[in-house]
Amino acid sequence: MSHILVNVAWPYANGPRHIGHVAGFGVPSDVYARYERMKGNDVLMVSGTDEHGTPILVEADKEGVSAQELANRYNRVIAKDLCDLGLSYDLFTRTTTGNHEKVVQELFKQCLENGYIYKGTQKVAISPSTGRTLPDRYIEGTCPICGADGARGDQCDACGNELDPDELLNPVSKINGETPRFEETEHFFLDLPALAEANLAWLKTREGWRTNVINFSIGLFKEVKPRAITRDIDWGIPVPVKGWIDNPNKKLYVWFDAVIGYLSASIEWARRKGDPEAWRAWWNDPTTPGYYFMGKDNITFHSQIWPSEMLAYNGQGSKGGETGKLGPLNMPEQVVASEFMTMEGKKFSSSRGIVIYVKDILARYPVDAVRYYISVAGPESSDSDFTWAEFVRHNNEELAASWGNLVNRVANLINKNFGEIPAFDEASATDEDRALLAETKAAFETVGGLIENHRQKNALSEAMRVVGDINKYISATEPWKIKDNPARLGTVLHTAAQAVSDANHLLAPFLPHSAQKVWEALGGTGVFSPLPRLEEVEDLDKPGFTYPIITGDYKLGETVHPWASEPIVAGTSVPKPHPIFAKIPPEAVEEELARFDAELKARREAEAARLAAEKAKLEG
């Protein structure tokens, strides 16, 4: 058994998450974690809501509520959505916990002591009309690197590069469209140049990374500059330095603190299970690999910023230094970044109404239909497009007509003819029977190898190819025509049931909800595919502060079945089956497109009205 760390990108708590988000960080990470657990490995899968920084302030200002109120609301919304999607976190928490603040400040202080954090000045944007500092994400303009419009003051989504507001061309305020002025202010900086040699050397040892990820990551080191890790903002983690700790308008930069969340969540998980040092097996043991799942817009922070923070904390940059009490921290084994998903040919945008939220699609369609579509058509290594027509087609042709129908046919034939799993009669067995069982057993290595190499689309395609071959076997053997030969009929149906069971194991990481139903359709009892749960907890360091976490019980041999062919048992009662998957009516496509157009129009009108009101206020 090996320890496997699965770190999942932290969604901003500034609104509900949409399908484009979970296609990048959510479902792929869960498929991988579920597979590794079935392999017998000890997986720790962590994440949480990212609740500091300007995205929260921007939305809170729009709604006229405090940043904490907004974070509290969307922490609950997001946690429920991700739990409903079946994402099997060991701990999904948040960045406003006392535990997270302590861990972040510990890393800052050690990096400062080691000489990798220093004080300097930086230009900040000021609103001419109010005199207020405008945080990074309140500023938009043209990217100086790729020329894309709509780049933010902290990052360009088009090219993925990190930016400072004063680097933007033609910068304007998102609040009211005015042009900001820039003034020098004091900040702390992370000395990335002093860490670049060690960071790049580590990157060049990486094997098996997606080509786009490793090439982009290495390209970040063509020109490395120090980055400010504090901001003129009143919402965030206090800077743990005398003269700064009590300053209400100086906080740590959200991206310095957010990536530390993987470590702080692991520590919180260990504290909550009553073994405060248990996290070290995943972070201090150099043989333990850590896999980071995200969208491609977060590559910079996981292949440069977070590794640099760890190198600085470990004292492994050009200035040397001591390892902090939490270290030495393991560098990432792999950064698994997906490309972007669009919707009906348009870029996802909540503000513009180009969106389908997780909670909405799960309210109208089965969860595994959603997971299946994300897995089969998601942006694994190239951009992909969510279309309602393809969503319905994949569900109807592949889940309902192929896989679901196969399960029902086999279970129904067994129930009607035997009422239980029939025996496999060697005397009546044929090469055709043995070939099918050999194929399904061999598929574990093939499908598993593809998942391990983060080629989940191919893995799912291979599993569904096996499903197709089982269907062909049923058609070729025609069990409904051999009822007068009980021994042969029993052997065919035993073979089919074993093959279906094997296919269910192969599909379980992708389709955990229906995998449980298939298990029960073949007479299985107990938990086959464990699902996560929400728990309301109290903060470990801030009495009275409560919030929901996602957690679960995922134990091999108890709630997790192995990544292997488990022999079915003759004599197991098989009940009358019920449909596993239902077809979605074809007219749903037009209904969804009409809903999409109506919501798009309404959101555009609302945003235009808001901007007009802001402009009128400014001019008045």
Curated annotation (Swiss-Prot):
It is found in: Cytoplasm. It comes from the Bacteria. Binds 1 zinc ion per subunit. ATP binds at residue 350. Transmembrane segments: none annotated. Its cofactor is Zn(2+). Its main location: cytoplasm. InterPro entries: Anticodon_Met, M/V/L/I-tRNA-synth_anticd-bd, Met-tRNA_ligase_1, Met-tRNA_synth, Methionyl/Leucyl_tRNA_Synth, MetRS_core, MetRS_Zn, Rossmann-like_a/b/a_fold. One of its GO terms (molecular function) is ATP binding. It holds the Pfam family tRNA-synt_1g. Zn(2+) binds at residues 143, 146, 156, 159. A motif ('HIGH' region) lies at residues 11-21. It catalyses: tRNA(Met) + L-methionine + ATP = L-methionyl-tRNA(Met) + AMP + diphosphate. SUPFAM superfamilies: Anticodon-binding domain of a subclass of class I aminoacyl-tRNA synthetases (SSF47323), Methionyl-tRNA synthetase (MetRS), Zn-domain (SSF57770), Nucleotidylyl transferase (SSF52374). Keywords: Aminoacyl-tRNA synthetase, ATP-binding, Cytoplasm, Ligase, Metal-binding, Nucleotide-binding, Protein biosynthesis, Zinc. A motif ('KMSKS' region) lies at residues 347-351. One of its GO terms (cellular component) is cytosol. Its EC number is 6.1.1.10. One of its GO terms (biological process) is methionyl-tRNA aminoacylation. HAMAP family: Met_tRNA_synth_type1 (MF_00098). Belongs to the class-I aminoacyl-tRNA synthetase family. MetG type 1 subfamily. Monomer. Is required not only for elongation of protein synthesis but also for the initiation of all mRNA translation through initiator tRNA(fMet) aminoacylation. This is Methionine--tRNA ligase. It comes from Bifidobacterium adolescentis (strain ATCC 15703 / DSM 20083 / NCTC 11814 / E194a). The gene is metG.
